[in-house]
A protein has these predicted regions:
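N-terminal strand-loop element at the rim of the active site
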Residues: 5-68, 75, 164-166, 236-239, ...
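A conserved mid-protein helix/loop that constitutes part of the nucleotide-sugar donor-binding site
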Residues: 13-21, 197, 201-220, 237-243
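A charged, aromatic-enriched C-terminal amphipathic alpha-helix characteristic of glycosyltransferases
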Residues: 14, 336-369
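Short hydrophobic beta-strand element within catalytic cores of glycosyltransferases
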Residues: 35-36, 296-300, 305
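Short His-centered aromatic/hydrophobic patch
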Residues: 87-95, 112
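A short, active-site helix/loop in glycosyltransferases that binds the activated sugar's phosphate group
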Residues: 138-177
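Aromatic "clamp/platform" in nucleotide-sugar-dependent glycosyltransferases that forms part
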Residues: 260, 279
């Protein structure tokens, strides 16, 4: 079997990490390739090449997406050796599906990793998504989504309800297992005292992730003379805004922004409470990693139920006043780490092996039709 994954980029991020790990897992079962719709080299490419995965590039899409269809079709016509094209391009999956089938690719699997954003409410975007759904319904052979909400958003509730499958994003659970030694080492490296209360977060620094709420909470806790520290693991276009906010709140000495990181486990070890106040999430892989580390978590009501596995995940509505968030953080602090996190997640089928085996089963079902 030959499988080609189609992605926008392979830089560090939840979707990209999922595809990278899936490629590495499936490469032991079949021939795998990855088509990146961007000519720039991505963060994960070297790791994929080491695993024997073929990497291809085409130019990034323009605003009209016409060049995307033309470039995809030209690529697929010269790579008909692939049995299945698996697309991870959100709404643009419709264009990928049509280009693949028009070029003679036998089977197409579409994968949804996200839910509606504020800009998706515009009439032009709604019409665009309607067209993309029609293309996917006509050309795709299987619909996968990381959550029910993600499936309903991309494919439409009726279509996804009839033929779609929810495959929660899995992780290598043991990779995130908590270590006292790593905690002490990382906290020392970051300059944290044993008495410091560290609120942490991992993810891209952007408006959707809503990290400014974490800083607001830290500012209030600081006024209460709580020795709070904030650890933001990631990089993004909001970094300077967040640094300015920290300065305005007079907590700049208590906030660390690490920038992009290839591994997050040691940083999770250093945290006391994990916050994930996103305005929108298709799944929330970072939250699952924090749960695997045993961290008590405070999350927004926009997080999908599929990823809220442990009882130590506390959900607060974004419409609630900030005092409700502070109370949740204080409750999480009292809860402490879960000592059975790894075993519970494995039992609930949240391992990457369980996830990728489900995808492998879907591939075989698609080829048998």
């Amino acid at each position: 079997m030959r499988i080609l994954q189609v992605v926008r980029t392979m830089n560090i991020g939840g979707l990209e990490n999922f595809v990278k790990n899936m490629l590495q897992y499936l490469s032991e079962k079949c021939d795998c390739g990855c088509l990146i719709c961007d000519e720039k080299k991505s963060d994960h490419e070297d790791d994929l090449v080491k695993a024997g995965i073929k990497i291809y590039h085409i130019p990034e899409p323009d605003k009209t997406k016409i060049n995307l269809y033309n470039n995809l079709q030209a690529f697929f016509e010269t790579h008909r050796e692939y049995d299945i094209v698996h697309c991870h391009m959100a709404g643009t999956n419709g264009i990928v599906s049509k280009a693949a089938k028009d070029a003679g690719i036998n089977k197409v699997v579409c994968h949804s990793h996200g839910v509606a954003l504020q800009q998706d409410e515009a009439l032009s975007m709604k019409l665009y998504m309607l067209c993309m759904r029609k293309l996917m319904q006509r050309h795709a052979d299987a619909f996968i989504a990381c959550s029910k909400a993600a499936g309903n958003y991309l494919y439409g509730q009726e279509s996804f309800g009839e033929v779609g499958k929810v495959v929660p994003n899995g992780i290598e659970i043991n990779r995130y297992r908590y270590s006292d030694d790593e905690r002490n080492s990382c906290r020392e490296e970051l300059g944290f005292k044993e008495s410091d209360f560290v609120i942490g977060h991992t993810g891209s620094l952007n408006s959707v992730k809503n990290q400014e709420l974490i800083l607001d909470i830290a500012g209030i806790l600081k006024e209460k003379r709580i020795p709070v520290k904030v650890l933001l693991v990631g990089g993004g276009n909001r970094e300077q805004d967040l640094k300015k906010q920290a300065k305005d709140l007079k907590i700049e000495e208590d906030v660390i922004i690490t920038g992009k990181q290839m591994g997050v486990t040691k940083f999770l070890d250093a945290m006391d409470v994990f916050m994930f106040p996103s305005r929108s999430e298709g799944f929330g892989l970072s939250l699952l990693e924090a749960e695997a580390n045993g961290l008590p978590c405070v999350v927004s009501d926009k997080i999908q139920p599929e990823v809220k596995v442990l009882n130590s995940v506390l959900s607060v509505s974004l419409n609630e006043p900030i005092q409700c968030w502070i109370e949740a953080v204080e409750k999480a602090k009292v809860l402490g780490r879960s000592k059975m996190a790894n075993e519970i997640l494995d039992e609930k089928g949240m391992s990457e092996a369980a996830c990728y085996e489900t995808v492998w089963k879907i591939y075989n079902e698609v080829l048998s039709k």
